[in-house]
């Protein structure tokens, strides 16, 4: 990173930086994957190019498995807006004589590797303090009744009370499913009724509606309200349930506020947002509140990439000395572990092929069979495996 300038696309001093850019050979611009920020980035790139002729651009998409990678770039009518913008970005910059390379970063790159055959694949190094899948303690669970979940929560609170920790309960149904289903709101309400028995300091629900939180002790509730009022954060309250718009607060800061209110063990209930690339860790520098336990009840047909992404919320480098525990069915755990073993075989084969992915490479590997689809059915990955 010598002679490299790293900034965000929203940096208010960007123009003045460009005017005095003689000392920089490389610019790194960080942005969100949405059409507005992609357009802003294109404008910044052109501004730099006009000042100092750019030789090349590298677009790096994190969570690359969810980025649309259409084969036919001339027909993007039915593609997401961000994808259209990236195609437009690539074409316009190429027309100006700038070389463009695209890199997709993903822990679950199946739809990239199986279908799109990238020209080169890098296996990124894993930090020594990384807590991986092999460090997760599996506890078979088939009874997801309120009584059984309450007992598990009480046990986890006893085990985590000194060290602290966050419990994630990834449920089968979304917030808007039938009221008789075991959906997020029903699970949330059931656990609130048993909050005293669990010993949890706080119960939260995290989804597209925002963040809901209930505290066991009045003292912690008062501290939290005082905290968010001091920060001028908007909230509503209904029957002791505090509601915060997730657009007003990032999840790491929210957990940081809970930690500041002396919350040691916290439960978060959710579904889709837990299955994505979000780190459930507070923003505290020292001993951050970290997801260390997961109770997982996915649907019977949920694909293995989603299983891996959800259970992956327990992995990482935060609080690496704390034990991790997973409560789920034997079917889920076996598919998860088989999926990871298959990944190892694929990466090994690609490495032996000079890090290139040939058309027949995947189909030539003897992969272990799973009882669930590899990825979304619309991708039809299984046909590329046989």
Per-segment meaning from a language model:
Residues 152-156, 160-162, 179-198, 317-386:
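C-terminal helicase lobe and adjacent C-terminal extensions/tails of nucleic-acid helicase motors
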């Amino acid at each position: 990173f010598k002679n490299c300038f790293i900034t965000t696309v929203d940096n208010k001093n960007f123009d003045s930086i460009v005017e005095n850019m003689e000392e920089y050979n490389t610019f790194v611009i960080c942005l969100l994957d949405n059409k507005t920020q992609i357009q802003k980035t294109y404008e910044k790139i052109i501004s730099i190019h006009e000042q100092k002729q750019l030789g090349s651009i590298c677009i790096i998409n994190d969570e690359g498995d969810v980025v649309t990678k259409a084969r036919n770039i001339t027909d993007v009518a039915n593609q997401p807006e961000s994808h259209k913008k990236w195609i437009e970005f690539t074409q316009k910059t190429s027309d100006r004589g700038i070389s463009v390379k695209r890199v997709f970063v993903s822990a679950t790159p199946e739809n990239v590797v199986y279908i799109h055959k990238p020209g080169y694949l890098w296996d990124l190094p894993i930090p020594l303090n990384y807590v991986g899948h092999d460090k997760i303690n599996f506890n078979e669970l088939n009874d997801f009744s309120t009584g059984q979940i309450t007992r598990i929560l009480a046990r986890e609170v006893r085990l985590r009370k000194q060290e602290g920790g966050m419990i994630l309960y990834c449920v089968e149904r979304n917030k808007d499913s039938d009221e008789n289903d075991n959906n997020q709101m029903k699970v949330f309400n059931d656990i609130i009724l048993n909050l005293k028995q669990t010993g949890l300091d706080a119960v939260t629900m995290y989804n597209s509606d925002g963040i809901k939180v209930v505290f066991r002790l009045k003292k912690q509730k008062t501290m939290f309200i005082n905290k968010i009022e001091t920060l001028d954060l908007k909230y509503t309250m209904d029957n002791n349930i505090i509601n915060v718009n997730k657009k007003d607060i990032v999840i790491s800061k929210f957990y940081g506020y809970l930690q500041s209110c002396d919350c040691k063990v916290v439960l978060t209930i959710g579904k889709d947002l837990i299955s994505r690339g979000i780190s459930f860790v507070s923003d505290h520098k020292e001993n951050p509140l970290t997801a260390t336990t997961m109770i997982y009840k996915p649907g019977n047909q949920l694909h293995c990439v989603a299983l891996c992404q959800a259970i992956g919320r327990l992995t990482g480098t935060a609080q690496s000395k704390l034990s991790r525990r997973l409560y789920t069915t034997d079917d889920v755990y076996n598919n998860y572990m088989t999926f990871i073993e298959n990944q190892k075989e694929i990466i090994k084969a690609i490495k032996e092929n000079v890090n290139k992915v040939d058309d027949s490479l995947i189909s030539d590997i003897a992969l272990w069979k799973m009882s669930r689809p590899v990825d979304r059915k619309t991708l039809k990955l299984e046909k590329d495996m046989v």
